[in-house]
Amino acid sequence: MLITRTPETAQEWEQYYQLRYTVLREPWGQLKGSEVLQDEDQSDHAMVIDSETNEIVGVARMQTNTPTQGQVRCVAVAPHVQGRGVGKLLMQYLENLAQQKGIKEIILDARENAVKFYLSIGYEIFEDSYLLFGEIQHWKMRKDFNAAF
C-alpha cells in the first residue's frame, strides 16, 4: 500500500533527500549535498512510502511564492515505480495542501521527459524555461485551480 505524507523522522528525511539526489542529481555528476536547497525549512514536503517495504518511492516539495501562488520543485520518483501513479499521488497531495492554504495557482519547471505527465494531470505549458546541466530542457508549466475545477 502506498501512503503519501510529510517525512517525520530523521531517517525518513535522510531517505527523502537520498532519493532526490539519486534521481535528480547523481546521474549528471552533481555533488552529494546539492539536492538540499537553502529554503527547505520554508517549503512543504511530500513523500510516498510503500508501507509493505517501508521504502520511500517518491518525493516532492512546494514553496509558497505569493499568498496565491505555489511552486512545486524537486519531484523525484524511484525508477522502478515510475509510471505507476506515484507522481500523481505526490501532486494530488501538494495540490490539496495548496488549496487548503488558499493558493490559486501552482507553477513548476518540468524536465522535458516529464512534460507529458504534467499535461495529463491538468498543467499547461506557458513558456520555455532553462537548460539544466547544459542538456536537460525545462518548460514552465502551471495549473490554475480556478480554471481546473
Predicted regions: what they are:
Residues 1-121, 126-145, 149:
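Anionic, Ser/Thr-rich low-complexity intrinsically disordered regions
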